[in-house]
């Protein structure tokens, strides 16, 4: 029975490693953009614009009034 619980305890560690691997695989192509200053500038501007647009959309969807 202890062998069973040893196997059960291994699954959360496996899950964390799979999730971290997936995140690193998805994010790693974006690190290439930071090698050149011009592409990093455009990437930062684009990412900031994306965040602003998403924030505005979510505020409108949830009818959140600011100030």
Curated annotation (Swiss-Prot):
UniProt keyword Plastid present: yes
UniProt-listed Pfam families: DUF751
Record lineage: Eukaryota, Rhodophyta, Bangiophyceae, Bangiales, Bangiaceae
Similarity section: Belongs to the ycf33 family.
Gene that encodes it: ycf33
Keywords: Chloroplast, Plastid
Main localization category: plastid
Protein name: Uncharacterized protein ycf33
One GO CC term, this protein: chloroplast
InterPro entries the UniProt entry points to: Uncharacterised_Ycf33 (IPR008470)
Protein location: Plastid, Chloroplast
